[in-house]
């Protein structure tokens, strides 16, 4: 009986050992194939003169190891950033974020990476920003889904991929591997428009039969590309025409009634302000959205598209790179600007002038000289209604203002609250 037991135990040990060896060889074989594909990907990117900056948070670090474990990475990769802590992510994106793992955050990171690549002296047409954010299995079980969002930003398009993982069937290491695979796959797929597109490998992502990757792409018109590349400061949001081109002259931006804002989203409060301002000024409102902003990340193409579609077809919407008001008044000379009280107050806040009161004074004098006037509306600010008539405005601006009293207009609609409900 004991001899039989020993024989059975020996057989089981052999089977276990053989299985381990098989799995080890199988895994190493797949790793070798993946390494070969990564090497081929780097070669293809290098041949197209592509330069990449990667930013990932919450997972996906295996993609970094895959890209740098062999030769050729230095010809393609400019920088990798891993803002893992909440404060680190907020510092990178310019403030507290409503959610840390979402398609929007992935796009913000990708645009940040794209801008960084351009700042490192990469021609915009060759710059690629990859942003990834993941919520994966951790020591403490998560109430939400396990998911990965990967965005790729180029001069030509914004692409976002979302993968929701089947919860509770994989180890953290396995989910990390899939996150890394998805990053590599999206990098390869988003860079296949060059002359060497046939040389790019198809990167594998180990999904179950129930899992699918959802992809959304926003392709930019030429005017948007010129704006993002910095070749233009202002474009018509719905037109291919740009300033200096045959269809659009600088006269079209002079003596306008301009309503600047982020409009994320455009809501009834904005509509009421525009309607009343139009009656006061006797001309139609034209909206302005700056893709760059002192307080917020640069807007990507998907962001722009989602905001612009909310405007009526007959309404004119301008896209600019004017993050400072001193730039807006140059783009729209002798125009009247529609502002909320909170935005109006920023015009004389030294924080927006590197803390310099002298720079602030110079800017205020310049703005007052360039504009036709302001129409200023009251807004809820820090929990209470701010009546613009109660503000201690600089005299040079005060003389140019038409304040709309609370009796004529008040709405407490919050864009922040609307975004919160929209993103739930």
Predicted regions and their residues:
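N-terminal chloroplast transit peptides
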Residues: 2-8
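Generic short N-terminal amphipathic or hydrophobic helices
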Residues: 11-14
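Nucleotidyltransferase catalytic core that binds NTPs
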Residues: 26-45, 66-69, 82-87, 91-94, ...
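Short, conserved "active-site rim" segments that organize catalytic pockets and cofactor/ligand binding
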Residues: 45-78
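Amphipathic alpha-helical interface surfaces
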Residues: 63, 105-113, 359-363
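Helix-adjacent hinge/juxtasegments
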Residues: 93-119
């Amino acid at each position: 009986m004991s001899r039989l037991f020993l024989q059975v135990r020996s057989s089981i040990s052999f089977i276990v050992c053989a299985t381990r060896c098989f799995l080890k060889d199988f895994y190493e074989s797949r790793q070798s194939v993946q390494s070969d594909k990564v090497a081929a990907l780097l070669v293809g990117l290098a041949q197209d003169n592509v330069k990449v900056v990667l930013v990932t948070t919450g997972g996906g670090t295996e993609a970094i190891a895959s890209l740098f474990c062999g030769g050729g990475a230095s010809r393609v990769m400019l920088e990798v950033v891993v803002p893992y802590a909440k404060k680190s992510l907020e510092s990178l994106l310019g403030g507290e974020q409503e959610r840390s793992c979402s398609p929007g955050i992935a796009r913000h990171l990708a645009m940040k990476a794209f801008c960084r690549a351009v700042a490192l002296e990469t021609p915009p047409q060759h710059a690629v920003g990859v942003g990834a954010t993941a919520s994966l299995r951790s020591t403490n079980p998560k109430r939400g889904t396990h998911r990965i969002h990967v965005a790729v930003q180029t001069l030509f398009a914004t692409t976002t991929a979302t993968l929701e993982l089947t919860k509770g069937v994989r180890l953290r290491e396995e989910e990390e591997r899939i996150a890394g695979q998805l990053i590599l796959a999206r990098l390869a797929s988003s860079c296949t428009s060059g002359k060497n597109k046939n040389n790019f490998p198809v990167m594998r992502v180990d999904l179950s039969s129930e899992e699918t990757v959802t992809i959304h792409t926003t392709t930019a018109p030429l005017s948007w590309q010129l704006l993002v590349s910095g070749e233009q400061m202002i474009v018509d949001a719905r037109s291919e025409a740009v300033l200096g081109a045959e269809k659009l002259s600088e006269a079209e931006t002079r003596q306008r009634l301009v309503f600047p804002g982020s409009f994320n989203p455009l809501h009834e409060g904005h509509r009421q302000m525009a309607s009343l301002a139009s009656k006061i000024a006797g001309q139609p409102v034209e909206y302005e959205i700056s893709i760059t902003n002192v307080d917020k990340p640069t807007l990507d193409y998907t962001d722009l598209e989602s905001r612009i579609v909310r405007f009526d077809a007959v309404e004119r919407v301008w896209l600019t790179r004017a993050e400072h008001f001193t730039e807006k008044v140059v783009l729209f000379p002798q125009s009247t600007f529609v502002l909320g009280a909170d935005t109006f107050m920023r015009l004389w806040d030294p924080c927006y002038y590197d803390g310099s009161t002298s720079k602030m004074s110079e800017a205020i004098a310049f703005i007052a000289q360039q504009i036709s006037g302001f129409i200023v509306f009251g807004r809820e600010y820090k929990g209470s209604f701010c009546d613009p008539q109660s503000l201690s405005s600089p005299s040079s601006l005060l003389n140019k203002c038409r304040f709309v009293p609370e009796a004529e207009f008040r709405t407490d609609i919050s864009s922040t609250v609307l975004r919160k409900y929209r993103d739930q």
